[in-house]
Amino acid sequence: NLVIRKKTRIFATYILILIDMEKKRIIEAMHNRLHEIDPHAKAILFGSRARGTEHEGSDWDVLILLDKPKVTLQDYDKYSYPLRELGWDIDEIINPVLFSQKEWEENHYTLFNHNVNKEGIAI
C-alpha cells in the first residue's frame, strides 16, 4: 500500500512537470511570435494562466504594450492576428489585448491595470 501511494505521488509530480513544461513551451512560442513582429514590444501574461489558477480550456490572456503614442486598427492586424493564429496552430485560445505604453500609463488607476501589474508575468 505504501509503494502504491509513493508511485501515485511520483506520477502526480511527473504530470505537474509535464504541464509546467507545456506552459513554458506555449509562453516561449508567444514570445517568439511577438519578437518576430516587433522585437521592442512588451508582452505580459495575465489572468488565470499567470495566477496558476487555470483549468482545462482556459485561454491565454496577453497584454501587448507598444512603443507608440496610440494603438491603431492596423496594430490589431499586425499584433493580434499572428498570436491568435498561433493559438489555432497549437489548439489554444490566445487573447491579445493591445495598449500603447502611454495609454497604459495614463490608465494606471483602473482595476485592470492594477491586476495586471500585480499578477502579470512578463513574456
Where are these regions (language model features)?
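Catalytic core of pol beta-like nucleotidyltransferases
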Residues: 3-42, 50-56, 67-123
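Short, aliphatic-rich beta-strand segments
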Residues: 61-65
